């Protein structure tokens, strides 16, 4: 295939450094992610290489020009997310920026990948949503941001955040301290996320009034959760019985989000409640399953590589096991 060449010009009035990033960081990140050569001199940007990739780069810079015109500067981390959106057939990557879930103390929480955007859209349009994927994909954080936003808009009367408390083979009865002290370490990730989104004093006040509840999954038994946004975290550590119990707590004007990662199961020798739930509920109306992938990991670039390395290790181990079985 014959190489393609184009020349782009940074629009008048836009500082090229806003487009290319500090120290040309955006430019370097871009070249590492596309099959094209990109050279910037002054206000000119020359792009050459695979025709499809050249077109992709042109669309990327159209997005970068719009961001710069609005006073925003892309970071090197933004490049891979933007390219992923454009490669997926979207014509404009700004849909992620425009979808603000929550603003707190000048910090904006929004989906950062197309997978996250689809997950958020699924939560908005379904009563029950399962968010499945590896660590760092924002499953719980985005769900909690939507929950807090719903509470602030008075769409629901309370938030309920829950997770199984028996993990890593530990039995709470054998741990020292009061029940609250035993439970607190398991709930801490939920507290941390909540304090990222709301004033701590206000959060404490709402918790005292029962408007926000953070409790172990076992505390959901026998209840009907109405007028509530409920998030069940670490669902891979539920049993099938616990999962059924939780799902049947649904009341009127409520929304349930269940998050989990099947690669991080702590249940030993037992089947978890997340393993078969898509086969059971996959065709039930108003229930959505959103699968987040490694491309949706946004914590730190290294987290994505760690997840990828573990997946490769697990795949290789499974292949060796199959080979041994076939050789017998």
Regions found by a protein language model. Give the residues of each.
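Hydrophobic side chains in well-ordered alpha-helices
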Residues: 19, 57-60, 243-246
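Interdomain "pre-motor" coupling segment immediately N-terminal to P-loop NTPase/helicase cores
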Residues: 39-96
